[in-house]
Curated annotation (Swiss-Prot):
Similarity section: Belongs to the Antp homeobox family. Proboscipedia subfamily.
Any Gene Ontology biological process: anterior/posterior pattern specification
Protein name: Homeobox protein Hox-A2
CDD domains in the cross-refs: homeodomain
Source species taxonomy: Eukaryota, Metazoa, Chordata, Craniata, Vertebrata
Any matching Pfam family: Homeodomain
GO molecular function annotations of the record: DNA-binding transcription factor activity; DNA-binding transcription factor activity, RNA polymerase II-specific; DNA-binding transcription repressor activity, RNA polymerase II-specific; RNA polymerase II cis-regulatory region sequence-specific DNA binding; sequence-specific DNA binding; sequence-specific double-stranded DNA binding
Region spans: Disordered: 42-96, 194-225
Species, as recorded: Rattus norvegicus (Rat)
DNA-binding region: 139-198
Length: 372
């Protein structure tokens, strides 16, 4: 039994040719017999399937005398040498290419983990790592790295032609050392990028137009509000001026009525001097004959001047009134009260209505047309 085991080990360490392995196939009984011998000689604690070489009929010592003779002449080797024996068998396998690894990886992943663990011992750790790497990286396609010159030429062509015909695409691909598919894909991506850029610009322009319209509307509304506010201020100012004017007239009439009864020729308190009053004072120096009459006229005219009245527009200039005499003043007083000349020494009785009429007649004089 030991002799057979030694001859078996010697055959395992030997290197049979590939033709012998392929031409001679054992019967089913021999295969099971050799596997049972191998498993009986090994330790019964671990059940290891027979290696790939034991499935070949050359395990029988009497089948090939040349192999048995070679096995008898080789030195004995330890069982540790049988563990490293699959390495030369792996060297006989054809080289593996990346596309072959991808297919193998797909098949290996389909197998359950238990079957993979009980597989032949010739698959080492390195091979499993290579299969894992090939399965992980083979599914992803690498991006094309274009050079600066290629990108420049492609951008130039895209500037003139957004779409390429096939002859031009083939020409550019040959010129730039690219494939036709790469040129086609680049133009597709560039067209999509151009479309996104134009859409973004249109959106920005539309938003800017809406903002400008809103700003213009706000400005117009502000201007309208300002104009309305100014109009309201002007109207309120005009109303205040009219109220102040009527209040001054009423105050003057109330002060002049008792002074007329007392016969006093006192001056009345008037608002600050205007340009018309200054002209009246200058006019007093030219006609010193009637100082009292002109002073009363100036004060009354300054107090009740209203250039907007229709009487003021119809009155001629004051060139005809450069010289006033006492007779004219007396005539005016006679028109107001016929009993005034006869009762000069007595207090004059002038009603409020007659005084208002007197002030209205004086306001008709247009003092702005005075010519000096």
């Amino acid at each position: 039994m030991n002799y057979e085991f030694e001859r078996e080990i010697g055959f395992i360490n030997s290197q049979p040719s590939l033709a012998e392995c392929l031409t001679s196939f054992p019967p089913v009984a021999d295969t099971f017999q050799s596997s049972s011998i191998k498993t009986s000689t090994l330790s019964h604690s671990t059940l290891i399937p027979p290696p790939f070489e034991q499935t070949i009929p050359s395990l029988n010592p009497g089948s090939h005398p040349r192999q048995s003779a070679g096995a008898g002449g080789r030195p004995k080797s330890s069982p540790a040498g049988s563990r490293g024996s699959p390495v030369p068998a792996r060297a006989l396998q054809p080289p593996e290419y990346p596309w072959m690894k991808e297919k193998k990886a797909a098949k290996k992943t389909a197998l359950p983990p238990a079957a993979a663990s009980t597989g032949p011992a010739c698959l080492g750790h390195k091979e499993s790592l290579e299969i894992a790497d090939g399965s992980g990286g083979g599914s992803r396609r690498l991006r094309t790295a274009y050079t600066n010159t290629q990108l420049l030429e492609l951008e130039k062509e895209f500037h003139f032609n957004k779409y390429l015909c096939r002859p031009r695409r083939v020409e550019i691909a040959a010129l730039l050392d690219l494939t036709e598919r790469q040129v086609k894909v680049w133009f597709q991506n560039r067209r999509m990028k151009h479309k996104r850029q134009t859409q973004c610009k249109e959106n920005q322009n539309s938003e800017g137009k809406f903002k400008n319209l809103e700003d213009s509307d706000k400005v117009e509304e502000d201007e309208e509000e300002k104009s309305l506010f100014e109009q309201a201020l002007s109207v309120s100012g005009a109303l205040l001026e009219r109220e102040g004017y009527t209040f001054q007239q009423n105050a003057l009439s109330q002060q002049q009525a008792p002074n007329g009864h007392n016969g006093d020729s006192q001056t009345f308190p008037v608002s600050p001097l205007t340009s018309n009053e200054k002209n009246l004072k200058h006019f007093q120096h030219q006609s010193p004959t009637v100082p009292n009459c002109l002073s009363t006229m100036g004060q009354n005219c300054g107090a009740g001047l209203n250039n907007d009245s229709p009487e003021a527009l119809e009155v001629p200039s004051l060139q005809d009134f450069n010289v006033f005499s006492t007779d004219s003043c007396l005539q005016l007083s006679d028109a107001l009260s016929p009993s005034l000349p006869g009762s000069l020494g007595s207090p004059v009785d002038i009603s409020a209505d007659s005084f208002d009429f007197f002030t209205d007649t004086l306001t008709t004089i247009d003092l702005q047309h005075l010519n000096y």
